[in-house]
From Swiss-Prot:
Entry function: Functions in the biosynthesis of branched-chain amino acids. Catalyzes the dehydration of (2R,3R)-2,3-dihydroxy-3-methylpentanoate (2,3-dihydroxy-3-methylvalerate) into 2-oxo-3-methylpentanoate (2-oxo-3-methylvalerate) and of (2R)-2,3-dihydroxy-3-methylbutanoate (2,3-dihydroxyisovalerate) into 2-oxo-3-methylbutanoate (2-oxoisovalerate), the penultimate precursor to L-isoleucine and L-valine, respectively.
Pathway: Amino-acid biosynthesis; L-isoleucine biosynthesis; L-isoleucine from 2-oxobutanoate: step 3/4; Amino-acid biosynthesis; L-valine biosynthesis; L-valine from pyruvate: step 3/4
Protein name: Dihydroxy-acid dehydratase
Cofactor: [2Fe-2S] cluster; Mg(2+)
Organism (species): Pseudomonas putida (strain W619)
Active site positions: 515
Residues annotated as binding Mg(2+): 81, 123-124, 489
C-alpha cells in the first residue's frame, strides 16, 4: 500500500519543525493523518478566462475538507495570448507553458502533496498543468474556468468573438463606429474565448483523456451549473486518493488513465471537432511527459480516418461553445465516434469505470436521464459580467439533430476528412500541420509563389501595405521555438489576409504557430524550424510551392541539387534571419530557446542536452 507522500513532512519526531509550520497554516492534529491535496489555481486579473477564478480554489478546498482531505492552494501564472498578440509579448506565451509545468512540479514536490486539483482555463495553462500532472503521476483532476458567452450585436447576424473584432479592425471599409461596436460586444463575459480556440479545445480534450468531468469543456463560465463541476471535483479527488493510497488502486493515476489509447481518443476528438492546431503541440508535449509513445505520425494516421463531426467558430460563424453544450457537449461527440467504431471505450476515467459507461450516462442521444438533459440545456444569459456562476438561463430544447445540428453523426458528417491534417514534404521533412476545418475546399490543392518574411512583424507590415497578392504563399520563418524564440502565434497575419479579401486566395506557411482563432489555408509548425536548419529557411521569393491536403504533402518546386546548394550557402551564413529584427530577447527567452525542440516534438525541452547533469 503506498504511503501518503505528505508523511515525509508530517510524521516522525524529526519533522516537528515542519509540523509547526503546517500548524501555522491552520492544520490540526487530526489533519496530519489525511491526504494533503494541492489546488493549483491560475487566477489573474490579466486574463478574462481566469479573472473569475479567485474564490473558486477555496470553493474546492472546502469541499475537499468536507470529504476528508486537507486542501492547500497555490497559484500559477497565466498569459493572455490575445492581449500578448501582435507584439513581443507573444514571445513569452509558449515558454510560459514550461514555467507553469515547472511551477506545479516545484510546489507539489517541495511540499510533498498527495494529489492535485488543477484549476486551469486558457491557452498554455491547461497544457502546462497537464504536463505537470503526467510528470508527477499522482491522483489529479482538472476543472477549468469554462468558456465565455458569445458576443451579440445588432450589426451581425451571428455570435461574435475575439477574431471578429480583429478582422473588422483591419477592414478599411468598416467605420470607426462599427469597429467600436464589435470591440465592445465581442468578449462580453468572463471565460475562455467563445469559439473552438486553443483554450476550449484543450479543456475539451481533458474530458477525452479521462482527467476531467463531463461538461468541463463546454459549460459556460457564467452558468450556475459550473459550480457543481468544482464541488464534484473536490469530492472526486479525495475519492481518488482513497483508492490509490488506501486500496493500492493505481488505475486512478494519470498515466494509467491518460495512456496511449486515451491520447488516441483525445486526438480523434480534436480531429472530429476541428480543434486548434496548438492542441497537437500540447498533446505531443504531454505525451512526452507521461512517457507515452504518441507522436506526429500517430496524428497523421488518425487524421486520415476520422470525419469532422462538429464545426464551431472560427471554422463556421453559426456555432460557439454554448451551442456545443446545447448539442450534448463532448460526450456526444465521443458517442458519435464510439458508434463509428473508432473510440477506445474500455478506458477508465476519473469519474467512471470506463468511457463506455460514461458515454451511456452522458451522451444525450443515448440517455433518458432528465438531469443530464437539463444539464446540457444550460445556456447564455447575454449579460456582460466577470462573475462566475452568475446566471441560470436554460435553452427550451436540446440540439439533438445529428443530421443538420452542431454535432453530427458519422452518416451526416460535415466532411469525411477530419478537421486537422499533417503534411510532409521537402519543405517540412518532419511535418507541418493545418486545420482543414477552416480551409475552403476550393483551395485544398494550392500552388503559389513564395513571398518571404523573416518575422511576423514584417509580414503584418507587408500584408497591410498590399505587398501580398492573390496566389501568393506567405512564408513567415524564424518564428519557431528556437528562432522566435517562443513560437509566436500568427493570428494577426491571417486576420489581415481575411480583411484584405485574400482569405481564399493566399496560403500561409510558418515554423511558428497559429491561434485557435485562425482559419484559412494556414499551415504551421513546419519542422525542422528554420533556426534548426529546416528547409523553410531555404525558400526564396518567387519559388513555387505546391500544397496538396488530400495527399498530405507540401513541396518546394525546386530540385534536390538546388536545395543542396542553397543549404551549403546557408550553412556558411548561419541559420538566422536575413534582416535585423528589432526584438528584445531577454535572458529568460534565451534560456528557453537553448533547450527548445522543434514543433514535431511538441516544442518541449531537449532532454538529451540534460543527460549526465
Amino acid at each position: 500500500m503506498p504511503d501518503y507522500r505528505s508523511k515525509t513532512s508530517t510524521q516522525g519526531r524529526n519533522m516537528a519543525g515542519a509540523r509547526a509550520l503546517w500548524r501555522a497554516t491552520g492544520m490540526k492534529d487530526e489533519d496530519f493523518k489525511k491526504p494533503i491535496i494541492a489546488i493549483a489555481n491560475s487566477f489573474t486579473q490579466f486574463v478574462p478566462g481566469h479573472v473569475h477564478l479567485k474564490d473558486l480554489g477555496q470553493l474546492v478546498a472546502r469541499e475537499i475538507e468536507r470529504a476528508g482531505g486537507v486542501a492547500k492552494e497555490f497559484n500559477t501564472i497565466a498569459v493572455d495570448d490575445g492581449i500578448a498578440m501582435g507584439h513581443d509579448g507573444m514571445l513569452y506565451s509558449l515558454p510560459s507553458r514550461e514555467i507553469i509545468a515547472d511551477a506545479v512540479e516545484y510546489m507539489v514536490n517541495a511540499h510533498c502533496a498527495d494529489a492535485i486539483v488543477c484549476i486551469s482555463n486558457c491557452d498554455k495553462i491547461t497544457p502546462g498543468m497537464l504536463m505537470a500532472a503526467l510528470r508527477l503521476n499522482i491522483p489529479v483532476i482538472f476543472v477549468s474556468g469554462g468558456p465565455m458567452e458569445a458576443g451579440k450585436t445588432k450589426l451581425a447576424s451571428h455570435g461574435l468573438d475575439l477574431v471578429d473584432a480583429m478582422v473588422i479592425a483591419a477592414d478599411s471599409s468598416a467605420s470607426d463606429e462599427k469597429v467600436a461596436e464589435y470591440e465592445r460586444s465581442a468578449c462580453p463575459t468572463c471565460g475562455s474565448c467563445s469559439g473552438m480556440f486553443t483554450a476550449n479545445s484543450m479543456n475539451c480534450l481533458t474530458e477525452a483523456l479521462g482527467l476531467a468531468l463531463p461538461g468541463n469543456g463546454s459549460t459556460l463560465a457564467t452558468h450556475a451549473d459550473r459550480e457543481q463541476l468544482f464541488l464534484t471535483a473536490g469530492r472526486t479527488i479525495v475519492e481518488l486518493c482513497k483508492r490509490y493510497y488506501g486500496e493500492n488502486d493505481d488505475s486512478v493515476l494519470p498515466r494509467s488513465i491518460a495512456n496511449f489509447k486515451a491520447f488516441e481518443n483525445a486526438m480523434m476528438l480534436d480531429i472530429a471537432m476541428g480543434g486548434s492546431t496548438n492542441t497537437i503541440l500540447h498533446l505531443l508535449a504531454a505525451a512526452q511527459e507521461g512517457e507515452v509513445a504518441f507522436d506526429l505520425r500517430d496524428i497523421d494516421r488518425l487524421s486520415r480516418k476520422v470525419p469532422q463531426l462538429c464545426k464551431v467558430a472560427p471554422n463556421i460563424q453559426k456555432y460557439h461553445m454554448e451551442d456545443v453544450h446545447r448539442a450534448g457537449g463532448i460526450f456526444s461527440i465521443l458517442g458519435s465516434l464510439a458508434r463509428g467504431g473508432l473510440l477506445h471505450t474500455d478506458l477508465p476515467t476519473v469519474h467512471s469505470r470506463s468511457m463506455e459507461e460514461a458515454i451511456a450516462k452522458w451522451d444525450i442521444t443515448q440517455t433518458d436521464d432528465e438531469a443530464v438533459h437539463t444539464f446540457f440545456k444550460a445556456g447564455p444569459a447575454g449579460i456582460p459580467t466577470q462573475t462566475a456562476f452568475s446566471q441560470s438561463t436554460r435553452w427550451e430544447t436540446l440540439d439533438d439533430d445529428r443530421e443538420n445540428g452542431c454535432i453530427r453523426s458519422f452518416e451526416h458528417a460535415y466532411s469525411q476528412e477530419g478537421g486537422l491534417a499533417v503534411l510532409y514534404g521537402n519543405i517540412a521533412l518532419d511535418g507541418c500541420v493545418v486545420k482543414t476545418a477552416g480551409v475552403d475546399e476550393s483551395i485544398h490543392v494550392f500552388e503559389g509563389n513564395a513571398k518571404i518574411f523573416e518575422s511576423q512583424d514584417s509580414a503584418v507590415r507587408g500584408i497591410l501595405a498590399d505587398e501580398v497578392k492573390a496566389g501568393d504563399i506567405v512564408i513567415i520563418r524564424y518564428e519557431g521555438p528556437k528562432g522566435g524564440p517562443g513560437m509566436q502565434e500568427m493570428l494577426y497575419p491571417t486576420s489581415y489576409l481575411k480583411s484584405k479579401g485574400l482569405g481564399k486566395a493566399c496560403a500561409l506557411l510558418t515554423d511558428g504557430r497559429f491561434s485557435g482563432g485562425t482559419s484559412g489555408l494556414s499551415i504551421g509548425h513546419a519542422s525542422p524550424e528554420a533556426a534548426a536548419g529546416g528547409a523553410i529557411g531555404l525558400v526564396r521569393d518567387g519559388d513555387k510551392v505546391l500544397i496538396d491536403i488530400p495527399n498530405r504533402s507540401i513541396n518546394l518546386q525546386v530540385s534536390d541539387e538546388e536545395l543542396a546548394a542553397r543549404r551549403v550557402e546557408q550553412d556558411k551564413k548561419g541559420w538566422k534571419p536575413a534582416e535585423v529584427r528589432p526584438r528584445k530577447v531577454t535572458t529568460a527567452l534565451k534560456a528557453y530557446a537553448l533547450l527548445a525542440t522543434s514543433a514535431d516534438k511538441g516544442a518541449v525541452r531537449n532532454k538529451a542536452m540534460l543527460e549526465g547533469l
